[in-house]
């Protein structure tokens, strides 16, 4: 079974699109050198970002211009 599950992640966001954007933006920050905030054995930035979302380490703010 995949952890975290999509059902668990969907409780953290309002849509799958938001989840994809939030994970992609955080993964980009990690690639650019940001410190990871979740305990994760993976070296893959997208996996780390997904785990951070699941552990409520990061969140998003919806503005008129997009997700911040």
UniProtKB/Swiss-Prot annotation:
SUPFAM superfamilies named in the record: RPB6/omega subunit-like
GO cellular component labels: DNA-directed RNA polymerase complex
Single GO MF descriptor: DNA-directed RNA polymerase activity
GO biological process, one term: DNA-templated transcription
EC number per UniProt: 2.7.7.6
Top EC group: transferase
Catalytic activity: RNA(n) + a ribonucleoside 5'-triphosphate = RNA(n+1) + diphosphate
UniProt keywords, alphabetically: DNA-directed RNA polymerase, Nucleotidyltransferase, Transcription, Transferase
Purpose of the protein: Promotes RNA polymerase assembly. Latches the N- and C-terminal regions of the beta' subunit thereby facilitating its interaction with the beta and alpha subunits.
UniProt subunit comment: The RNAP catalytic core consists of 2 alpha, 1 beta, 1 beta' and 1 omega subunit. When a sigma factor is associated with the core the holoenzyme is formed, which can initiate transcription.
Family: Belongs to the RNA polymerase subunit omega family.
Name used for this protein in its record: DNA-directed RNA polymerase subunit omega
Source organism per UniProt: Ruminiclostridium cellulolyticum (strain ATCC 35319 / DSM 5812 / JCM 6584 / H10) (Clostridium cellulolyticum)
């Amino acid at each position: 079974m995949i952890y975290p599950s999509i059902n668990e992640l969907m409780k953290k966001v309002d849509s799958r699109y938001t989840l994809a954007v939030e994970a992609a933006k955080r993964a980009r920050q990690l690639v650019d050198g940001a410190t990871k905030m979740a305990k994760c054995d993976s070296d893959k930035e997208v996996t780390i970002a997904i785990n951070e979302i699941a552990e409520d380490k990061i969140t998003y703010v919806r503005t008129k211009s997009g997700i911040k």
